[in-house]
Amino acid sequence: MRSWLHLGLLFLALPLLAQSNAGELRLKVTGPDGLPIKASVELSSDALQFHRSFSTDDSGQLIARNLSFGLYRLQVQRESFSPHDGLIEIHSALPTEYVVKLSIAALSTAVNVTADATLLDPERTTTINHLDSKAIADRPASLPGRSLPDLVNSQPGWLYEGNAVLHPRGSEYQTQFVVDGIPLTDNRSPSLGPEIEADDVDSLTIYTAGIPAEYGRKMGGVIEVNTLRDARADGVLHGDVVLSGGSFDTAGAFVRVQDTFGRNTVGASASGNMTARYLNPVVPENYTNRGTIGDFSLSYDRDITPTDRLTLSVRHELSRFEIPNEQLQQFPQLQSPPGTTRQLQTRDNFETMGLASYQHIFSPNVLVNLRGMVRDNSNDLNSNNGAWPIAAFLHNEFKEGYFNAAVSIHHGRHEWKAGVESDNLFLHENFSDIVTASLTPDQNGACYPFDCATPPSFSFLGSRPDLEQSAFVQDLVHLGKWTVNAGLRWDHYQLVVNQNAVSPRFSVARHFPAASLIVHASYDRVFQTPSFENILLASSPDVTVLNANVLRLPVQPSHGNYFEFGATKSFHDRFRFDANYFRRYVDNYADDDQILSTAASFPIAFRKAIIYGAEGKVDLPHWNRFSGFLSYSYIVGNAWFPVTGGLFIGDDAVNGATQLTGHFPDSQDQRNTVRARIRYQLMSRLWFAAGSEYGSGLPFDFTGTYAQALAEYGQQVVDRINFADGRISPTFSFDLSAGAELYKKETRSLRLQADVENLNNRLNILNFAGLFSGNAIAPPRSYFLRLAATF
């Protein structure tokens, strides 16, 4: 532990930093005589679904931080003074200083603009989905471990596979979460990565195209997660308490507090959740699926001077859960030969991270940020003596040291940003298995489900560093009605292979004010590093003992070209329509596979993939009492043989070595996805909402027989699988929600929300991947309550 502290202090001493297209507003409110005024401030943007209430301090000042680039409506009010109502732009990382001079009400009238003026951001060069604190607070209920992924999955272009694994525009394991400016590139699904609770998140910004050059390595989609909250001007202790519960013995609690004294702000949060349906079960009966999760965080923020700011935080997260059984694992007497003990496999994940950032403003046009992180992550898989057909044990961990540095420069029409980053992961893998199925040949000379020559036991222990460095430069240029965002990024990756790459990025937008229209186009050259989950095992020569036929190829990084063309239009100053067409070309296309039908997976790669599609979304921020959205996604994805990386055993090895041509559907090739949610504000303190989701079904590749599938998963599941077409039957769910504000006084409130999900109680199969692993069934009809108090 001491060595990690030394390493963390070293990072803080280095000239490094980073990311996020966000700025800062420094507001001062005065009276007609120039003296400061304590006033109420409303800041909002319909384009960003953003609405915040602030108040200036006794000196008339207010600092609003972490504001995503965009156009905002600023409203300032104080009794006896005429209110101010105007627009303000945030398009620079440099603080925007703004002075509002209020006039005596009897002598002046307000400057009026309509809120609809913020429905479009004329300088946005790509479609970016943004979710703010209100959308997060009023979200539909989620099972533990999924509150954050569910929010992301509600956006166009994103799909769930089993167990809330996010797939942006057909990409496998290429999702990157950027938490308070620090990128997390490992798998953050409930089965592998402890969750940051959505109640602890202030805002989300989601990219699938036009991705800034400061982001790299995992490029299917980038999710900026902001957990930092502005301090209250009155310095009063404040926070939130949330209690929730519902179907599947689900219960949870969350608490967050924050206090400000002088130039210091201290915050803390904690949460705990439990459920009897943690993962997506493989059969409708939901066998062995209990899970508990928890997290705890502390943060400290100090404004050292008006130009220097220090932020420190530490977070600890954990999850413990069971692996769902299918029929033969739950009822060992049905196995061949019959068993006596029911299978129980468990997993646990633990993570502790410390983050530090420092900001210095050299001048009104130059700002430097430094950020660093140290992280310790471990995940385990254990099996009892009833595990079938294999008992697997896994004890993996990694330690990570990350730092970055960036400088932001405002010069005329240009917003320059340049930086460097280094990420060093020290991987440790410990895997072992014991085959519990019979390895004795039957009367036909065959064994099931493994080859008769499979070793009855196997173990692997390995360690290796994953070293990655990068540098970038980007420029946001304002040219009247045109906006250009151009960047260049260099990456170096060293693990199983050693590679460098240079990636240009370019996006452009044109605003047509008379038509309330923005058209945009983007090109992203991407360099994507493989998932490091069990990559040392898959790359080791030790695996050659598993079968007479083993194909072992080093997993190369993916190289790709992303194109997007789109438009955004405002209609009647009430709702906004976004439409995009995208096309992705990727070499060494990343995918994954399981180790001998266990719950442990590893990366593989195919020669190339071509993925294209279209997305559309209608956003209705507010119209009378209504608000909501409707989105549609169309995607076609194909991957091409041969395999170019990974581990292949038995028949898979033979096929991998001989199948050199042809293509097949990408695992996320769901042609049609529709999502909708509409909310009606019945009265000021009571609202109702309805939502639905339709998916045309994912493809699957099943190597077993119909009889085997029936024995493993039962008739209900098999009836939802189209074996002839190789696709899962369409999914559909209809949801209802209602919310009431039970109490409201000044900054204190008490809210109650009720949700009914999958009201139609349809058996929705999310994924069907083969024998003993990969199936995923969505929840049946379920009910949830959430009580939230703010003080």
Predicted segments with their positions:
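Periplasmic N-terminal accessory/gating domains of Gram-negative outer-membrane beta-barrel systems
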Residues: 82, 86-101, 107-212, 217, ...
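Gram-negative outer-membrane beta-barrel transporters
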Residues: 478-483, 581-585, 604-703
